[in-house]
Regions:
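Metal-ion/cofactor- or nucleotide/acyl-coenzyme-handling active-site neighborhoods
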Residues: 1-220
Length: 220
């Protein structure tokens, strides 16, 4: 996986139609400009992959997080669609058709950013935002990719552990691939350290952190 950054991203072409004529393929493409300029003070983000640890830490608290003096510790929040159903996120990621419909019908997309695939953006013009560079990752792994893409230097991973319910078993390796692609970014896996995948904690740019430590460190 290659590290990419929003500062270098002007936009990308999206394929609208593909045709085969006389054995030759032709495509109709449309340029989609980058619609987001993400300005953040602290360089910190929280990626909420699931509500698994909600009994230990109510992630909804982050919706009101101010980050201490002058917002120096404020966290931008990234979360999957299920989390977006419970709180306002700075950036949500959802690719499931059923959950996208739920977010749209609830009015969530009117005032909030929801990233999804090019196919779903074309199917629902003006409702969703295009995932930059189509990373080909599961939603839960897209979160840290986007946070690093946006230039955050410290990323706190909440709801990521061995018991996180994800249908595709490759998800933990995808998370590791993101970590490896951004060696200059510090990834904190928040929760019970013994419940984390060992492969996540092998790189020098990762660290396990309890919720008590997270609350103190981020002034939550």
């Amino acid at each position: 996986m290659q590290a990419r950054y929003r500062t270098d991203y002007a936009g990308e072409f999206v394929i609208l139609e593909t045709r085969w004529t006389g054995g030759r393929k032709t495509q109709t493409r449309e340029w989609v400009s980058n619609p987001i300029e993400n300005h953040h003070i602290s360089g910190r983000a929280a990626c909420i992959g699931s509500a698994f640890d909600a009994d230990r830490f109510n992630h909804v608290r982050l919706q009101r997080h101010r980050g201490g003096l002058l917002g120096s510790k404020k966290l931008q929040t990234y979360g999957v669609g299920d989390i977006a159903s419970t709180m306002r996120l700075d950036f949500a990621v959802e690719t499931r058709v059923s959950q996208l419909a739920t977010l749209k019908e609830s009015g969530y997309t009117e005032k909030n950013i929801v990233y999804t695939t090019a196919r779903q953006c074309l199917a629902h013009p003006g409702e969703f935002y295009l995932l930059p560079h189509s990373p080909g990752l599961l939603d839960i792994a897209v979160l840290p990719y986007l946070a690093a893409f946006d230039g955050h230097q410290e990323i706190f991973m909440l709801g990521y552990n061995r018991e996180t319910a994800v249908e595709n078993a490759t998800w933990s390796q995808q998370v590791r691939n993101v970590v490896d692609a951004y060696p200059g970014v510090k990834f904190y896996f928040v929760g019970e350290p013994s419940n984390m995948y060992e492969a996540w904690l092998e790189p020098a740019n990762t660290q396990a952190m309890t919720y008590r430590e997270f609350i103190g460190y981020c002034d939550v």
